[in-house]
Amino acid sequence: MQPYTAPSEIALRQLDYFADKHVLVAGEVEDRFPIELRQYCASVSVFTTHYGYYSQLKAYPEITRYFGEQLTADLNADLILLYWPKAKQEAEYLLAMLLAKLGTGTEIVVVGENRSGVKSIEKMFAAYGPIHKYDSARRCSFYWGHCVHTPAAFDIEQWFKSYAVDYQGHELTIRSLPGVFSHGEFDLGSRLLLDTLPPLSGKVIDIGSGAGVLGCVMAKLNPHIELEMTDISALAIRSSQETLVANQLHGHVYPSDMFSDTGHHYNYIVTNPPFHSGLETSYSATERLLAESVDHLASGGSIWVVANSFLKYPPILEQAFGHCDIAAKTNKFAIYHAKK
């Protein structure tokens, strides 16, 4: 984990708000601040939808950690520290879910970068109670609020967006939760990748499955493949599972930080990899994925990657595989292919 993010630094200036509280941390938290916060609080729990962060917290037994698309466990918390997520709809989702769980009387601290749209909390929280900004620093804002109105019961079904994808005469229903890549649309990069793929057979893994578009189209066109779909986001995992069910398709969907929890000997690795971490652009995870992919392929297996054309991924694949082919290219996207 890196040094403290700017939202954590502004929270660090306001430790009195957390003194002796049972704090539940949620949202776009990326650093060790919850561990330091434990010194000032009665207890600290972390609910995260990010499997990588959840895995890193395993080293800190003083923190109770929860991973999933929904917090189902019973816990003692009287204050939520919400790190504002990059998607406004995800913030609405987290508020509705967590406040329905904890109820009236719950205090909330919201921290986030101003460019992320954290100011939206002022209107968003109105249904729950008062909230005000109490600090600004490092281009971030610090809000404190109090839930005084009874939150509505939370029903996750109300948060799915369903939309149709028509591909080669097959109409698929895609189910997507807030915060999932390409929420509510069939992105052009995924379409180009599907247009370029050969007929598939054997073990196929879709890494960074999002709402499950790639995996489900591959399963529809190649019904005999053994399909796995992974993502670092619990919201994406649930979305991919729902998309499979909606289309009566089969596959194994599970959380993994790139190859952290996957198997080996895949015949095909197919990926539309993410390159955003929070609000920042980050390529390190994808570069690691490309470099390690050769170790997870069967002999004769291949990787197929879609990426923005300007990204310098071919040298990484060339170093790992000894070659890299550009299978397709547009003004915006390129399809890279390498075979073991």
UniProtKB/Swiss-Prot annotation:
Its EC number is 2.1.1.172. Its main location: cytoplasm. Keywords: Cytoplasm, Methyltransferase, rRNA processing, S-adenosyl-L-methionine, Transferase. Coiled coil: none annotated. It catalyses: guanosine(1207) in 16S rRNA + S-adenosyl-L-methionine = N(2)-methylguanosine(1207) in 16S rRNA + S-adenosyl-L-homocysteine + H(+). Disulfide bonds: none annotated. It is found in: Cytoplasm. One of its GO terms (cellular component) is cytoplasm. It is an enzyme of class 2 (transferase). InterPro entries: DNA_methylase_N6_adenine_CS (IPR002052), Mtase_sm_N (IPR013675), rRNA_ssu_MeTfrase_C (IPR023543), RsmC/RlmG (IPR046977), SAM-dependent_MTases_sf (IPR029063), Small_mtfrase_dom (IPR007848). It comes from the Bacteria. One of its GO terms (biological process) is rRNA base methylation. One of its GO terms (molecular function) is rRNA (guanine-N2-)-methyltransferase activity. Belongs to the methyltransferase superfamily. RsmC family. Monomer. Specifically methylates the guanine in position 1207 of 16S rRNA in the 30S particle. NCBIfam families: PRK09489.1 (NF007023). This is Ribosomal RNA small subunit methyltransferase C. It comes from Vibrio cholerae serotype O1 (strain ATCC 39315 / El Tor Inaba N16961). The gene is rsmC.
